[in-house]
């Protein structure tokens, strides 16, 4: 065999090997796709309810005076009384949190159709917010009454929550998985196939929805409460969990 023929055969062999090398991954991928088992994907829903065991109050004290200093002093005195009353009612320091202090001038706008006259400052207002966690729901009405008496005149809202809802959420998870399994079995039976093992599962949990009392409703409750008592209806909180589950088909 001459040199030219030998070179031709070597080049041909290299080309065949190169084509084969590129063909193997594609063949393996195609083979893997054709051998992957059929699957059923479903979404399961689970819900649990629980009675609230804690109230979160958002209150504010507002005071007005001729000067900012006078308004601040009056606001501080009122807030100190409110905090002292909270502690006497059994509220721990960890459950009391004061928020921002807002100082605003009070303007009087002249009756000027052309808007040429400048407004004048007649005083100042100072407000301080307070967040209170009440762990004994039976005391919520009493604490609200005392707060208003001592100086809380701005608000505010009331949320009824669960301090530790972990057990309730876990039960909702179990219900969601059970719901997914039931759905998958129904689909498999309808399709005339068998349901295999779980190959994938993921949770799509939604944050719990506490029982809120809107700000306007809260003010109405405070204003209309007879005999110094604010009625509180605890109701129930709902906890919802969704899961995506993928099953093999036998």
Swiss-Prot record:
InterPro entries: 26kDa_periplasmic_antigen (IPR052022), SIMPL/DUF541 (IPR007497)
One of the protein's GO biological processes: DNA damage response
Pfam families xref list: SIMPL (PF04402)
Highest taxon of the lineage: Bacteria
Gene3D superfamilies from the UniProt entry: Protein of unknown function (DUF541), domain 1, Protein of unknown function (DUF541), domain 2
Cell compartments where the protein resides: Periplasm
Keywords: Periplasm, Signal
Keyword RNA-binding among record annotations: no
GO CC, alphabetical: periplasmic space
Signal peptide positions (record): 1-28
PANTHER family: PERIPLASMIC IMMUNOGENIC PROTEIN, SLR1258 PROTEIN
Name this polypeptide is given: 26 kDa periplasmic immunogenic protein
Native species: Brucella abortus (strain S19)
